[in-house]
């Protein structure tokens, strides 16, 4: 149990030292956990506690396939415990899960080693601790959606070994299926390795005949496919959803290249080396300084067969190649290059390395002192050589080499005491446990668990939630929160929103947002940069602000709570309306300039332009302009080399980043004749080439009037349904601001109508002249098929298990019957022999 409790206690102590709630006002929301996981957990909790649909959500990114998002981020079965968790403790719920799953990962590897080697010694926990507090976990423990797979992996290994050696595939099938269900992405890497590992196992345990070889291969294929089938109900909707993301494109590398040397990678075994979660490809493979010794002991052990050494060392070399060679890196990561978070399969390498080292550990008693000395000095020499050759001062502080030497010396000393019998075995084991706990905990403390302010993260939540909860709207609406902490604030605080940051982001929406001057990237799009025209097109009826807004004729104050102000936009288009017939064919959206795109819509509708140019002067990195009229001003930077801009508006200063993504910088309302100064903050002195625009409210009113002539009047709006009526003056197309998804079914007057994709982004349907009843219903593409496959797979597995139990019972009865018959025969023989012996004795007595 040390493999569980030591990592758990270590994590709790580190959390307390960091001041993580309840020990302080910090929280462990690192990178994507801050921006994605916490908001999505909140949305899931809200649906569970309020009875919402798990198929679709309006609170995320204009409306998303929630079943796909669930499959990608939330599918761990333990996440359903959120139904018992109050909203205000969601962050702590996630933190507790991380701690427990870290401990269970250590316990899992220890259990695997115990079962594989058939031993039950105290030392098995040492290697579990190193697995749970490895460099991989130090880098990625915040990535809560991966942890189930890390925890299940050793059990999957055991299941595969049972499949090969004992022809029993149930454990393998169930654990692999659970892994795929929990997180398909990491499971891709596990599945790739399973193909490698089954070959390795057949080399180590060669089948007795070709038929046995084919049987093992077919058994492996059957149970692997069955495992995928068990997860199909979650997997299939996700696969369909990912096809419309930017990651859906496939571009296999055309050349081979290597990122770094094997020596540099092995040096990553040294403790307290900075973890890599960026784009530099480095693997996080620390799993204890003792590994540097025990790996050499493994190679030198005479108790371990050459065949095993060859097989496992070959797998290690394959992993080194996978970390460094671009093509293998591409394949391991699901035929895509990872966007940061490199070498996501390195936990498999760590498990293999610890397996090899534990095999050497259990043969310590039979290892000569000479071999121990050679391994010790080999490890010391490697560290000294790494200090000389590794040139990466950002991640390798000079002290890490001395600390590594210190721990190697301690482990060498403990082995010496064991060999010479200087201490009792219990004293040596307890000392080793303490040293291992300290080493692993120190590495985690030094290289992991950064914190952020919990107070700041939840600061305005209660005010915003109360404002949104009290909205009494009789129609569809979306809400814009201007002071955003993340692009998923709608999910975090449960209101219909526009922005999204997710790997399941629709690529078409990202393109549309970029064309309209809003922020977008490969896996995100945001309301940042939107003009009132864009808000209107996207049905953004409400805006939440951190301060009172000046009167501009475009919005009215609706409510206030604490420091948050809720405004209602006057010119918000409905979720669906008949689009003027000339818009779809004539609106030019690929001009490359969002101001021109928005103004071109005005040209098509024959209204004034919504964005009017304002003169400006550029001098190198600086741009200045004077407001020609009072109004809302926007700046569009045309030089994509500029990424950061600082704007000085009177006495106020505002900073913008990622402006190379092509979004409007919203400067807010500026009075006439106020001078504004902007400066690029990038290195290299790029010229601040930009355009200044002022919004024209009168033009927006005219656009709204023309586009709102034939709106859809809603009578019902739920997570997966919309219904209402619409009157079309002439036959045409009904535009909706619902992202196009094949899962939507549209009925017009009770009859199915063919939906289509409008502006390459939105759901639309052709409508004939007259008044019509319209209804929308949603079911994720692939859900029905996936549910059917899962049901069949579960039934097949059940039948297979029952058949296996039946065969074993028959075999046991046969063995039992054979034993009874054998014993009966032996008893008869014994009786005859005894009878003969008695007769012989009587004969001898008579002769006497």
Where are these regions (language model features)?
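Active-site lumenal/periplasmic loops and adjacent helix-entry segments of GT-C-fold
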Residues: 14-117, 121-154, 178-182, 273-281
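Extracytoplasmic/lumenal acceptor-recognition loop(s) of multi-pass membrane glycoenzymes
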Residues: 435-455, 467-538, 571-573, 578-600, ...
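Periplasmic/ER-lumenal interhelical loops and adjacent helix-loop junctions
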Residues: 31, 35-44, 77, 216-219, ...
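Membrane-embedded helix bundles of polyisoprenyl
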Residues: 98-116, 121-205, 216-244, 379-384
